[in-house]
Structure formats: structure tokens, C-alpha cells
A protein has these predicted regions:
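Outer-envelope beta-barrel architecture signal
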Residues: 15-19, 31, 43-47, 83, ...
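Residues that define the transmembrane beta-barrel architecture of outer-membrane proteins
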Residues: 24, 29-33, 79-83, 128-132, ...
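N-terminal periplasmic accessory domains that precede
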Residues: 1-22, 31-36
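Transmembrane beta-strands of outer-membrane beta-barrel pores
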Residues: 23-27, 53-57, 105-109, 154-158, ...
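Flexible loop and strand-edge segments within Gram-negative outer membrane beta-barrel domains
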Residues: 56-62, 72-84, 90-149, 154-180, ...
Length: 264
């Protein structure tokens, strides 16, 4: 099982805050400043904020060979600009239960240089990406035998592709896609005796997809996952088993609605 957790602020020597600023640079207009701030808001509360920016021209040189003709060219439409920010709040309650809250944002705009075509250096394809999510996790240990963990998350993804060319109607092609996800999860861990662990988890998802394509179904999907897990360890012997129940239903604004799916 892979478990990844955000790094929590660590304050040493009685400090209540920590700041870090970094700037990196390189060829072809590359520059990447970033900042980090850790702040202690109270005896049981900490905050971390990270932000960064990246830009580059990307117009690197290359040699183009066309029979006996050799020319020195530069890559066009290779620029990129990205912005990224993240904030995390960590709190420990008096009963030792914990609450972690995260908010994350990413935005980028970049050119797509395309293929190298003789006598036609034109490249005007552009791509924009945006991602935002916020999530919260609560964990409480009631006793050495019982532990509860609950999570909630909202995730938003958006991208836009645009190309300008005479081959398109009105001289431009624009594609826009947006996906959103709403997620809830709760899990209970029970350890009745040493070496034996029983857990029950329930996950629920709502996923939406919207595009500007004509007659797009723009589906909405509802998903439910229920998992019962048992694990036993005795010395070097490890036994585990999992039972998962899945239910998925969908709605569409155009076209045929898929059948519900159930699996155990």
C-alpha cells in the first residue's frame, strides 16, 4: 500500500516561522522563482504556503538539412509560463485527533512547436491547463482498538487548445474541456487482538465532464466503492483478504445512457 502525506512544518530552537526563497535560471529564457513559508499559528496549529513560477522561451537552435542545403534554424512557439501555489493547514485537537486541510492551484500556458516543415516555420498552436483541488482529512483514535479516518476532496481540471489556421472554419479551432470530481471517504480500523486488523472503507465519487464539442454527452458519473479488509500476522506469516463492492451509474445530456455497473 502506497501512502503519501504532505510534509508538515517543523520548528526548531523555539522558532515560530521559517521562510525560504529560491531563484533558478537557465538557457533559453528559463527562470523559476519560488517561495516557501512555514508559520506556527498556535500550540497545535501550523501553516505552510508554497508558490512558484516558471517561464522559458524554449527557442533553441537546431540544424536543418535539406539535401545539399544546411541552415541554422530556431524552434518557434516553444514558450511556457506556469504558476503554482499550495497552502496546508495542520491542526491537532486536545483529544489527539488531527485535521489536515490542503488547497492547491496550477495554471499554465504554453506553445506547441509542432513538426519541422520546410519553408513553413509557422506554429500557432497553444495549450492552457488549469487545476485546482482542495481536500480535508480527519483522523481520530478512539482507543488502541478503534481508529477512524474521514476525507473529503474537490478536484477541478480545465484545459483549452487553440490553433489558428486557414484550414479551420472562421480560421480558428478551439477545444475546451472541464472535469470536476467530488469525493467523500470514511474508513474504520478495528484491532481486536494483537496481529489482527479489520477495516471497512466507504468511498463515494461524483464526476462531471463538459466540453464544447457539438453533441457531446457531457456525462455525470456516480460511483460507490465499499471495501472490507482483513489482515493477520503471526511471526513471519502474513495473511490478508479484501472484498470490494462497486456500483456505478451515469447520466448523459446527449446520446444513450450506459447501463449501471455492479460488481463484488
Amino acid at each position: 500500500v502506497l501512502s503519501i502525506e504532505t510534509e508538515k512544518p517543523v520548528f526548531e530552537n523555539g522558532k515560530s516561522s521559517l521562510s525560504q526563497i529560491q531563484i533558478r535560471g537557465g538557457a533559453f529564457g528559463y527562470i523559476a522563482p519560488s517561495i516557501r513559508r512555514w508559520q506556527k499559528l498556535g500550540e497545535h496549529t501550523g501553516l505552510s504556503v508554497d508558490a512558484s513560477f516558471i517561464r522559458a522561451d524554449g527557442n533553441y537552435p537546431f540544424t536543418l538539412e535539406n539535401g545539399k542545403y544546411i541552415t541554422q534554424e530556431k524552434r518557434n512557439n516553444s514558450d511556457i509560463h506556469t504558476w503554482q501555489g499550495e497552502a496546508n493547514l495542520f491542526h491537532t485537537f486536545h483529544d489527539e485527533s488531527t485535521l489536515d486541510v490542503k488547497a492547491y492551484y496550477f495554471y499554465s500556458e504554453r506553445g506547441l512547436p509542432g513538426a519541422v516543415i520546410l519553408y513553413n516555420p509557422k506554429a500557432e498552436e497553444r495549450l492552457w491547463d488549469e487545476n485546482f483541488f482542495t481536500q480535508a482529512r480527519y483522523k481520530k483514535t478512539f482507543s488502541p482498538k478503534w481508529t477512524l479516518q474521514a476525507q473529503a476532496k474537490f478536484n477541478h481540471s480545465w484545459n483549452k487548445y487553440e490553433d489558428t489556421d486557414v484550414k479551420y472554419e472562421n480560421g480558428k479551432q478551439t477545444d475546451i474541456n472541464r472535469q470536476d470530481e467530488y469525493y467523500l471517504s470514511a474508513a474504520v480500523l478495528y484491532q481486536p487482538v494483537k496481529g489482527l486488523e479489520l477495516s471497512l472503507a466507504q468511498d463515494g465519487f461524483i464526476n462531471t465532464l463538459h466540453t464544447n464539442i457539438n453533441d457531446s454527452p457531457n456525462p455525470v458519473r456516480y460511483s460507490s466503492l465499499t471495501a472490507l479488509n482483513a489482515r493477520y500476522q503471526w511471526g513471519r506469516i502474513k495473511l490478508s483478504g479484501t472484498l470490494v463492492g462497486t456500483f456505478i451509474t451515469e447520466e448523459v445530456k446527449a446520446g444513450n445512457t450506459p447501463d449501471d455497473r455492479k460488481r463484488l
